[in-house]
Swiss-Prot record:
HAMAP family: UPF0145
Alphabetical list of Gene3D superfamilies matching this protein: Hypothetical protein apc22750. Chain B (3.30.110.70)
Coiled-coil residue spans: none
UniProt name for this protein: UPF0145 protein STK_10800
Pfam families in the cross-refs: YbjQ_1 (PF01906)
Length: 114
């Protein structure tokens, strides 16, 4: 499933304009753990010497966030939700070259307001 193809509403806000929350399903979490491989670390090290954006890490971070978000959406759908509000991201370093990326929010059922 691609986030772009999702039929679930996602927002960082605590409500969705034009919608009424009719049921709160609970907290949903999506987690992924990524390792910065040796090749990426070497390329990033060279790039950091000259300055500027480290594209290898940017791409890895974007992919990890999308994967965590997609997993959160799947959990929300499994609960019967059609929206997730108050979505946030967090990350932690688990080991020297491993990072945990978490997407979390509140799964809810919404209906269009009249």
């Amino acid at each position: 499933m691609s986030f772009r193809e999702s039929d679930i509403l996602i927002t960082t806000a605590q409500e969705l304009p034009g919608y009424k929350i009719v049921e709160v399903k609970g907290v949903v979490i999506g987690i992924t753990v990524r390792s910065r491989g040796l090749g990426g670390n070497i390329a990033a090290s060279f790039r950091s010497l000259i300055g500027g954006e480290i594209k290898e890490y940017v791409e890895m971070a974007e992919q990890a966030r999308m994967q965590a978000l997609e997993r959160m959406i799947e959990r929300a759908k499994a609960l019967g939700a059609n929206a997730v509000i108050s979505v946030r991201f967090d990350s932690n370093e688990l080991a020297q070259n491993m990072d945990e990326i978490i997407a979390y929010g509140t799964a809810v059922v919404v209906t269009k307001s009249i």
